[in-house]
Amino acid sequence: MARIAGVDLPRDKRVEVALTYIYGIGRPKSNMILAATGVNPDTRVRDLTEDEVNRLRDYIDKNVVVEGDLRREVSLNIKRLMEIGCYRGLRHRRGLPVRGQRTKTNARTRKGPRRTVGVRRKK
């Protein structure tokens, strides 16, 4: 099993798909990496030579921000938005959608389950 950027790639998948198991690498970036390193995208991970695995590992380490570094960068960006008090930062702080979606109805994923407001009756 090939281990790249701290992630074990599945042996039975094509390299093009297997690279997408690494956080920060999707299909387009996977194809770009394979073209740059000269590895055939149709090769199965189990059939990769040690040299090909090392080329992929070196290229990803030097040229692509992945896994922990990328997660840290994203969380720091969100934290920065919250600190400067911009609109997007306020939406993050309140747990509401950030990209302009409606919130009168929907947005349940971001807002969480409904809180039913009870009615108090006079006695």
From Swiss-Prot:
Source organism per UniProt: Moorella thermoacetica (strain ATCC 39073 / JCM 9320)
One Pfam family in the UniProt entry = Ribosomal_S13
Q: How does it assemble?
A: Part of the 30S ribosomal subunit. Forms a loose heterodimer with protein S19. Forms two bridges to the 50S subunit in the 70S ribosome.
Coiled-coil features, chain-numbered ranges: none
In its keyword annotation, does this UniProt entry include Ribosomal protein?
yes
Q: Where is this region: Disordered?
A: 97-123
Protein encoded by which gene: rpsM
List the keywords (alphabetical).
Answer: Ribonucleoprotein, Ribosomal protein, RNA-binding, rRNA-binding, tRNA-binding
* Annotated GO biological process: translation
UniProt-listed SUPFAM superfamilies: S13-like H2TH domain (SSF46946)
User: Is-annotated flag, keyword Transferase?
Assistant: no
* Single Gene Ontology MF annotation: rRNA binding
Purpose? Located at the top of the head of the 30S subunit, it contacts several helices of the 16S rRNA. In the 70S ribosome it contacts the 23S rRNA (bridge B1a) and protein L5 of the 50S subunit (bridge B1b), connecting the 2 subunits; these bridges are implicated in subunit movement. Contacts the tRNAs in the A and P-sites.
**Which family is it part of?**
Belongs to the universal ribosomal protein uS13 family.
- Return the protein name: Small ribosomal subunit protein uS13
Gene Ontology cellular-component terms listed: cytosol; small ribosomal subunit
